[in-house]
């Protein structure tokens, strides 16, 4: 049964929230079958699937396409759609683009930073919002941990409180000191989802490509549960060898069909 924002808020302090990203229908289908309650269709798709050097190249059209694909694979899972760079510059622009993601199949939208006017506007128009503070990939110059100085930690903590006050029902905390994430989590009444923010958050999110070991780089705070890139390489090499040696297709295997017309 698909969870709504109220269900997810009710999990705070009771049960940890597991979240994975997905960008395609087959992956989304497997994630739903595993019982993961939330899928994030992140703008990370630009870097891990589309070959961009930055998430800033991702467009709203890209996000609509991938949200739709994920929805077709996971009809009973709460799906969060990322608002890509430049699509939430003001409340009305954000509403137009958030509506596009909802119509594509998202149940809620996520946006980076303490843009409280935008969050309030979306919530006022019945669009559930997930906030995001700490490291903000859309505008960050480096991917180093943030919040290590007292001033920076205080700023991030205040941002999280402002995002909650504006109406977000959940907040992603990215690549900040674990102690800071724990303090923020205790101070908020909405769930926090950590990515590189330690075990004291209310839940955790991983980029599915990182979890699968698919690609050639994975953040140090991620975990690889498999190494799918090695499997793809093995399969491709075996296929090539069998084609060259005429082992594939096998003459033993015959496919027959019946014309029903």
Task: Give the ranges of each region predicted by the language model.
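Alpha/beta enzyme core
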Residues: 2-226, 230-261
């Amino acid at each position: 049964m698909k969870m709504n924002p109220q269900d997810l808020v009710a999990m705070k302090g009771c049960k940890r929230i597991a979240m994975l990203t997905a960008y395609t229908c087959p992956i989304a289908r497997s994630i739903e079958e595993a019982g993961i309650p939330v899928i994030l269709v992140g703008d990370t798709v630009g870097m891990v699937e589309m070959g961009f050097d930055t998430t800033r190249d991702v467009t709203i059209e890209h996000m609509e396409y991938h949200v739709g694909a994920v929805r077709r694979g996971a009809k009973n899972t709460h799906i969060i759609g990322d608002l890509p760079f430049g699509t939430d510059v003001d409340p009305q622009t954000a509403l137009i683009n958030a509506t596009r993601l909802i119509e594509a199949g998202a149940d809620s939208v996520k946006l980076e930073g303490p843009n409280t006017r935008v969050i309030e506007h979306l919530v006022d128009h019945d669009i559930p919002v997930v906030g995001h503070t700490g490291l903000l990939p859309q505008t960050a110059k480096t991917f180093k941990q943030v919040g290590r100085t007292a001033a920076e930690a205080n700023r991030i903590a205040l941002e999280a409180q402002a995002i909650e006050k504006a109406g977000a029902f959940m907040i992603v905390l990215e690549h900040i000191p674990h102690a800071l994430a724990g303090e923020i989590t205790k101070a908020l009444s909405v769930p926090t989802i950590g990515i590189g923010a330690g075990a004291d958050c209310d839940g955790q999110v991983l980029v599915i490509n990182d979890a699968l070991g698919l690609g050639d780089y994975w953040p140090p705070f991620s975990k690889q549960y498999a190494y799918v890139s090695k499997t793809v390489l093995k399969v491709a090499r075996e296929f090539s060898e069998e084609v060259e040696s005429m082992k594939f297709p096998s003459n033993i295997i015959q496919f027959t069909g019946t014309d029903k017309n």
